[in-house]
Amino acid sequence: MQDHKITLFHANWSFCSQMVRVALFELNIKFDERHIKLCDQYAEGENLDKNFLDINPLATVPVIKINNEVIVNSTTIIEELNKRFQSNLCIEEDDSVKSFVKQTTITEGDKFASTIGTIIPVFSAPLIEFMIRKLPLKSIIKIIMKHPRKDRKMIFLSMYFFGVAKKFPNLAIKKFADELIKFEKLLNEDNTYFYNEFSHIDINMMCVFNRLEDLKLSEVITTNKTPLLQRYWKNLQKRDSYKKGILNYYTSKEHKVIKDFYNDAPSPFLKPILVELAKRN
């Protein structure tokens, strides 16, 4: 019986929010939720409001409250949920497992586009810029005045005024091809998931693959270079948590943004990635 009050502060389309929601559904944890309209997607910019900054002064999601305790960072949240609810979701987390978990999420302080997890935001940057440039000026002023992080403030302002993100993905194409091949070689054809049992790494990779779908890049895991990745993704899509924690949180807004941005065309970065993959052994 669950005797903790769990409240999740999250955003529908947030990469790391998706990870935590999947974990909550995998662990069968009941939770209240509060959707935060992020400043890079919505005019309201609720993550910059005082009531949210009082909860997380960094203005990021996801945040979870367990009773009155606040926990931030998706990896930390999932690890804490795993410990407190006596699950084996993360398996025995030795150093190698922790390293893989770190590589498959957005980790503060990691080198730019250095892992598969930190490459995803680079590929997402043009889409984020598309949303930011549709915001009213008053929302940009709110970012200038209230965003607590100078780095994010400068990125958002550069996107809004100068459209700097259009070519960001070019910086990560070769490394991304390397990362895909690396993960292909790490997979075991006898396992259903990364290991045989579903784990924290699988949560992160589920979100990585789903974001590739959003970015019109999913074809990169359907080549003859990545047969195990393709099978792995199909297995992840069969989990109930994929629908409950990710697909069910898409609204007409997210679908419209994708449609308007790509205009039913493939990603301009798809072919360069496929070319790089073809070069790999």
Residue ranges of each PLM-predicted region?
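Active-site-flanking alpha-helical
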Residues: 82, 208-209, 246
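Long, positively charged, glycine-interspersed low-complexity recognition regions
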Residues: 215-281
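GST-like domain detector, emphasizing the conserved glutathione-binding G-site
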Residues: 1-147, 272-281
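Short alpha-helical hairpin
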Residues: 29-30, 35, 52, 148-159, ...
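GST-like fold's C-terminal all-alpha helical module
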Residues: 109-234
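Conserved G/P- and acidic residue-centered "switch" motifs that form tight phosphate/ATP-binding loops
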Residues: 14, 202, 239
